């Protein structure tokens, strides 16, 4: 579930303004400024990049808005209800009062939405939210209190806290599997610097020990170095995540690994990707559903084009 990233300022510093490559591979795109993205089957839903707007559904210039009131959307996820039907869960904040937020469920069959009031708790706010088989997983932020963490709301049962999951930066839910990104901080080699160790992990609900899939280290300083990971997704027994590599040429990569750890991580081929740039890659959000993968490029610099693209054919990871 999107997220404003500290690396965006890095892209601005590089001052790169580049058009969509004209010869690069056959990834198809259309102009759109997308924030968060989610996909399931042949459905694609995305939020506005900034400010209040409409939730959009579909790929292409003719993509229509969903019949959901205009708002500021903070998190969206296409999943399934208890009967296996496709539904959309999302966090909506009032356009006029952005601190007044709630989580809603949209039913594509009835084209109706309803508030999930059971997720609310006084003094806390809901962050990212996911749904699978009718179970809602959500992050709860209570201002640094002991109540902070990930929670589950199963159909017909009360909200309960998820065991075995620390404070997370990103997470996803698919059936009984939770993937999450966790980070730990320690002092760096100089004043006003620090190290971040960031891990991608998966956990089976009901268990307390998670499996490590990837680990990166980033030195946070006026000139960041190392690598950072975020935006974990689950699909087809794989965990996906984005890696940001801080070198002279800032790079962004989409990786995946089987959730059982049976093979090492592999990276989405860079050839033909429209977010790849000469000095600094410009990947916004991404979404995956089986053989379909989408990604966005936001407009960091006035005059550059924001778009949503689809990877041509079956995505190749090596």
Predicted regions and their residues:
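Bacterial N-terminal signal peptides that target proteins for export
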Residues: 1-11
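Sequence signature of WD/YWTD-type beta-propeller architectures
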Residues: 24-318
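Bacterial N-terminal signal peptides
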Residues: 10-21
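Acidic, Pro/Ser/Gly/Ala-rich intrinsically disordered segments
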Residues: 2, 22-23
């Amino acid at each position: 579930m999107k997220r404003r990233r500290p690396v965006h300022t890095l892209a601005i510093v590089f001052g790169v303004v580049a058009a969509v490559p004209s010869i690069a591979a056959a990834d198809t795109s259309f102009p759109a400024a997308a924030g968060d993205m989610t996909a399931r089957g042949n459905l694609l839903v995305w939020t506005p990049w900034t400010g209040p707007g409409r939730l959009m559904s579909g790929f292409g210039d003719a993509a229509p808005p969903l019949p959901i009131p205009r708002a500021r959307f903070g998190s969206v996820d296409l999943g399934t209800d208890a009967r296996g039907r496709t539904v959309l869960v999302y966090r909506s904040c009032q356009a006029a009062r952005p601190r007044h937020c709630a989580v809603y469920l949209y039913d594509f069959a009835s084209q109706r939405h309803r508030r999930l009031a059971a997720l609310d708790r006084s003094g806390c706010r809901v962050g990212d939210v996911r749904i699978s088989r009718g179970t809602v997983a959500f992050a709860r932020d209570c201002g640094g209190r002991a109540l902070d963490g990930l929670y589950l709301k199963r159909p017909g049962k009360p909200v309960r806290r998820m065991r075995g999951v620390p404070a997370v930066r990103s997470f996803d839910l698919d059936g009984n599997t939770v993937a999450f990104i966790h980070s730990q901080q320690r002092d760096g080699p100089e004043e006003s610097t620090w190290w971040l160790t960031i891990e991608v992990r998966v956990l089976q609900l009901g268990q307390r020990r998670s499996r490590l899939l990837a680990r990166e280290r980033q030195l946070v300083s006026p000139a960041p170095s190392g690598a950072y990971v975020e935006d974990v997704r689950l699909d087809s027994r794989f965990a996906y995540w984005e890696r940001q590599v801080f070198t002279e040429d800032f790079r962004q990569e989409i990786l995946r690994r089987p959730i059982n750890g049976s093979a090492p991580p592999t990276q989405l081929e860079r050839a033909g990707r429209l977010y790849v740039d000469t000095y600094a890659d410009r990947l916004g959000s991404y979404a995956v559903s089986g053989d379909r993968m989408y990604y966005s490029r936001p407009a960091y610099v006035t005059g550059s084009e924001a778009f949503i693209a689809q990877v041509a054919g079956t995505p190749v990871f090596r």
